[in-house]
Structures are given as structure tokens and as C-alpha cells.
């Protein structure tokens, strides 16, 4: 069972927040929503499609909605991508627009929120939490 306002999918709960936050602030915000809350981790194409639809249906249209944070970012000085999501789960599904490392990952509106794009972690974007 999900909290009011959250959407259920295969045992997890999701909510799109129409607040613009940096990646770090968005992750912190998600952890404050519930004990096991984090920015969304996408583990399959099925989950990716669910999240894309949820974002498309719930995002408020502004100039800040081109991107939505997900729970993945570069963790070390060599700019390698973290080997796990912000919730600690392993990365076993990927859907990059292009294979390059900037800093933090988001979903891009142009791809109907289905492809991952590298973004500057300090930019404020909307985000989706998962518990």
C-alpha cells in the first residue's frame, strides 16, 4: 500500500514532485519522505515505461521540465558512474542517450522521459521519488 498521492508499481511507490531541486537536495528530500525513500532507481524497461508515463502525466509544464532527476550520479574523481543507485541497489538496466559522463543523471522530455541524459548536479530540476 502506498501513501496517499503516491503510485504503486510492482511493490514500490512513486511520486513526481514539481519542486525544482539540485540532485543532492532532491535525494535528501526523497529520503525525508519515508524511511526507504530515494530518487527513483530504474531496474527494467517495464519500470522505465511506468516512470516515464508517471512523469508525463504529473509534471507541471514550465521551462524547468525538460529534465527530471533519477537516482544515479558520478561518484569518483575519474568521473566513472556509480555502480549503484542512490538507494544502494545494483544497476542492471541502462538507457543512456549517449555514453558519456557528466555528473548526475536525469530523464529527458524530448525522449518522453524514457532516455537518460547527463546533467549538471547543481541545476535545479523536478524529480521522482521511490519508496
Swiss-Prot record:
Misc remark: Shows greater sequence similarity to the alpha than beta subunits compared to other heterodimer snaclecs.
Residues covered by the C-type lectin domain: 9-130
UniProt key word Cell inner membrane: no
One Pfam family it belongs to: Lectin_C
UniProt name for this protein: Snaclec A8
Any one GO MF annotation of this record: toxin activity
Localisation: Secreted
Cysteines paired by S-S bonds: 2-13, 30-129, 104-121
PROSITE patterns, per the entry: C_TYPE_LECTIN_1 (PS00615), C_TYPE_LECTIN_2 (PS50041)
Tissues and organs where the protein is expressed, per its UniProt entry: Expressed by the venom gland.
Keywords, alphabetical: Disulfide bond, Hemostasis impairing toxin, Secreted, Toxin
Membrane-spanning segments: none
Functional description taken from the UniProt entry: Interferes with one step of hemostasis (modulation of platelet aggregation, or coagulation cascade, for example).
Similarity comment: Belongs to the snaclec family.
GO cellular component: extracellular region
Oligomer status and interactors: Heterodimer; disulfide-linked.
Amino acid at each position: 500500500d502506498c501513501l496517499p498521492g503516491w503510485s504503486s508499481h510492482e511493490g514500490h511507490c512513486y511520486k513526481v514532485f514539481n519542486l525544482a531541486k539540485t540532485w543532492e537536495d532532491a535525494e535528501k528530500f526523497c529520503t525525508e519522505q519515508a524511511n526507504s525513500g530515494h530518487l527513483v532507481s530504474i531496474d527494467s524497461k517495464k519500470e522505465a515505461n511506468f516512470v516515464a508515463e508517471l512523469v508525463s502525466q504529473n509534471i507541471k509544464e514550465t521551462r524547468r521540465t525538460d529534465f527530471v532527476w533519477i537516482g544515479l550520479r558520478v561518484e569518483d574523481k575519474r568521473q566513472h558512474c556509480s555502480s549503484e543507485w542512490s538507494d544502494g541497489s545494483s544497476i542492471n538496466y541502462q538507457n543512456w542517450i549517449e555514453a558519456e559522463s557528466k555528473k548526475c543523471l536525469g530523464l529527458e522530455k524530448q525522449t518522453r522521459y524514457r532516455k537518460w541524459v547527463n546533467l549538471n548536479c547543481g541545476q535545479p530540476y523536478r524529480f521522482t521519488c521511490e519508496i
